[in-house]
Curated annotation (Swiss-Prot):
Listed name of the protein: Mimecan
GO biological process terms, semicolon-separated: articular cartilage development; bone development
Gene Ontology cellular-component terms listed: extracellular matrix; extracellular region
Residue ranges that the Swiss-Prot or TrEMBL entry lists as coiled coil: none
InterPro entries named in the record: Leu-rich_rpt, Leu-rich_rpt_typical-subtyp, LRR_dom_sf, Mimecan/Epiphycan/Opticin
Record bears the keyword ATP-binding: no
């Protein structure tokens, strides 16, 4: 009898009992960031979601303001220039392999230059003054072009530390006198200024033993500069107020055999002088100056 009851129980209730489903384990999550911006946004979002509930209460007002304030503080710190940074100048100008191009950007002063700058092009701006401090720490310069500015003053010694400087252009400015020039200069251009003879010292060019090209046209010179170096090849003095030349201007009156072998070109047109009256002044030259003879 008991055996029949047990069999009946198994037949009636076993089909109703089902095995428990297998436990599903969460698969690991993988985050793939397509780019840096997306990654940054995800990280910020995670930080926001991990804030305490009382901080996120009232939604965007508290947390967003805080986030923006913190972001602004970080931006201010990162943008604040340090003493040695070159970023401001190279954002304003173009810096490329030792060359700095600051042309036609209306700057009014020489910008701080990156160290190791060799070539500076700052043409057609509004620079009025060159100070000693502008190049105090930049001794690697080889070429400077300040053409087309408004330069009226150059402090004494502004170029004194530029011992490697070979080319300097101050053309189309408002200079009335010349600064002391660095010793290795090969090319100097001061065309179209307001320079008078008293604005050039007697020995301004004497020690420039590498100077080959000297451009002083369209100024207010009354005479040819003295003590021109033997290295000179091209001399432009056109359109000044030169009225006289003596026998020692280009030659040596006490040495009739002296010849200026390197001088190839002298331009003196546009001056109130008849060159034919001073033929002895050109006896050492291989070619006569360009200008009015009769």
């Amino acid at each position: 009898m008991k055996t029949l009851q047990a069999a009946f129980f198994l037949v009636a209730f076993v089909p109703l009992v089902k095995p428990a489903p297998p436990i599903q384990q969460d698969s690991p999550k993988f985050y793939e960031y397509v780019d840096a911006d997306f990654a940054t946004g995800s990280l910020i979002q995670q930080d926001y979601e991990m804030l305490p509930k009382d901080t996120i209460k009232d939604g965007t007002n508290v947390s967003l303001d805080t986030a923006l304030r913190l972001q602004a503080d970080d931006s201010e710190l990162s943008a604040r220039p340090t003493k040695d940074t070159n970023l401001p100048t190279c954002l304003l100008c173009v810096c490329l392999s030792g060359s700095v191009y600051c042309e036609e950007i209306d700057i009014e002063a020489v910008p701080p230059l990156p160290k190791e700058t060799a070539y500076l092009y700052a043409r057609f701006n509004k620079i009025k003054r060159i100070a000693v401090s502008d190049f105090a720490d930049i001794t690697t310069l080889r070429r400077i072009d300040f053409s087309g500015n408004m330069i009226e003053e150059i402090e004494d010694g502004a170029f004194s530390k530029l011992l490697l400087l070979e080319e300097l252009s101050l053309a189309e400015n408002r200079l009335v006198k010349l600064p002391v020039l660095p010793p290795k200069l090969t090319t100097f251009n001061a065309n179209q200024n307001r320079i008078k003879s008293r604005g050039i010292k007697n020995n301004a060019f004497k020690k420039l033993t590498n100077l080959a090209y000297l451009y002083l046209g369209h100024n207010a010179l009354e005479s040819v500069p003295l003590n021109l170096p033997e290295s000179l090849r091209i001399l432009h003095l056109q359109h000044n107020n030169i009225t006289t030349i003596n026998d020692d201007t280009f030659c040596k009156s006490n040495n009739t055999r002296y010849i200026r072998t390197r001088m190839d070109e002298i331009r003196m047109e546009g001056n109130p002088i008849l060159l034919a009256k001073h033929v002895n002044a050109f006896s050492c030259l291989r070619t006569l100056p360009v200008g009015t003879y009769y």
